């Protein structure tokens, strides 16, 4: 808008991956026919994994802005880059944070997506190496409207800290229902919970103190 880049005019094209791997693959194939030079996106690891080979084989540079799965940069794709830390790095930070907060018995909950499961596994390994007991490791099903069952299982494990590695819609609902059941255990999330909608779903009181 202000004259382009290096004296070249830049045209911006958009596609919506819908947060779905199949849709992302179709969108990547459409963009690959448009003579583009670079793509910024996508956000989720499973979404990126469905599209990165298409862009690489077409000679298109891809810069992912929120895809943290380790394997995305272990494939040797010369045109793939990202601007976020990998799951192994986030796992180290999560462990350091949990130790700093003094937790001794940690529950880890993920949602079976590439991102969430990868971060959960890295965090579990780091916590065990740091001699922090992991008393619960399981997954919920994304998109459900009631997580009382998994919260009951979590509570039965008697953790003093819960690390949820999934996304903000589920995190918000977990926080709300945790408060409704009168359970005050501290909760922490990964980078995918960084969205104002989490507070809207949980309610300000339930979101208070969430890490």
Describe the predicted segments one by one.
Residues 1-12, 128-132:
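Signal peptide-proximal N-terminal region
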Residues 12-14, 136-137:
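A structural preference for short, hydrophobic beta-strand core positions in alpha/beta folds
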Residues 14, 18-37, 96-100, 145-158:
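Short, well-structured alpha-helical segments in soluble
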Residues 22, 33-138, 186-211:
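Extracytoplasmic ligand/sensor domains, especially the bilobed periplasmic-binding protein
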